[in-house]
Amino acid sequence: MEYLLQEYLPILVFLGMASALAIVLILAAAVIAVRNPDPEKVSAYECGFNAFDDARMKFDVRFYLVSILFIIFDLEVAFLFPWAVSFASLSDVAFWGLMVFLAVLTVGFAYEWKKGALEWA
């Protein structure tokens, strides 16, 4: 137990100092901040023109779909790097576990492709 405390003490000190610095900076900003909002500063548009349309315009769902697919495959790469580094010392369970993971992602990618989620036309 004492060995673990010696190993992780620098990390705990770093996290404590980072948290303390963040709290000090937030409190300093709250104390020093100027609070005199006038109607011009809190208006939606500071350019002087009134809004022509509603600010909430429709956004194509395909952009969200592409971003979700990017996150999924980015996580796949994040899991593949440690697996590739320790490939020589993997057990059979770890190897086949990641093969199942890759198979599920491949099936999901094939499904998205077949449904036309990656088509923009």
Curated annotation (Swiss-Prot):
Q: Quickly give the catalysed reaction.
A: a quinone + NADH + 5 H(+)(in) = a quinol + NAD(+) + 4 H(+)(out)
TM ranges are 11-31, 65-85, 93-113
General function of this protein: NDH-1 shuttles electrons from NADH, via FMN and iron-sulfur (Fe-S) centers, to quinones in the respiratory chain. The immediate electron acceptor for the enzyme in this species is believed to be ubiquinone. Couples the redox reaction to proton translocation (for every two electrons transferred, four hydrogen ions are translocated across the cytoplasmic membrane), and thus conserves the redox energy in a proton gradient.
Catalytic class of the enzyme: translocase
Keyword terms of this UniProt record = Cell inner membrane, Cell membrane, Membrane, NAD, Quinone, Translocase, Transmembrane, Transmembrane helix, Transport, Ubiquinone
> From which lineage does this chain's organism come?
Bacteria, Pseudomonadati, Pseudomonadota, Alphaproteobacteria, Rhodobacterales
What Pfam families is this protein classified in?
Oxidored_q4
Checking InterPro entries in the record gives: NAD(P)H_OxRDtase_bac/plastid (IPR023043), NADH_UbQ/plastoQ_OxRdtase_su3 (IPR000440), NDAH_ubi_oxred_su3_sf (IPR038430)
How is the quaternary structure described? Answer: NDH-1 is composed of at least 14 different subunits, Nqo1 to Nqo14. The complex has a L-shaped structure, with the hydrophobic arm (subunits Nqo7, Nqo8, Nqo10 to Nqo14) embedded in the inner membrane and the hydrophilic peripheral arm (subunits Nqo1 to Nqo6, Nqo9) protruding into the bacterial cytoplasm. The hydrophilic domain contains all the redox centers.
The answer to whether keyword Lipid metabolism applies is no
Residues annotated as signal peptide: none
Task: Say which family it is in.
Answer: Belongs to the complex I subunit 3 family.
Subcellular location(s): the record lists: Cell inner membrane
- Name the Gene3D superfamilies on file: NADH:ubiquinone/plastoquinone oxidoreductase, chain 3
Q: What gene is this protein a product of?
A: nqo7
The UniProt GO MF terms for this protein read: NADH dehydrogenase (ubiquinone) activity; NADH:ubiquinone reductase (non-electrogenic) activity; quinone binding
In the Enzyme Commission scheme, what number(s) does this protein have? Answer: 7.1.1.-
**Organism this protein belongs to:** Paracoccus denitrificans
Membrane topology of this protein:
Multi-pass membrane protein
Name recorded for this polypeptide: NADH-quinone oxidoreductase subunit 7
- Main location (coarse class): membrane
Any GO CC annotation of this UniProt entry: NADH dehydrogenase complex
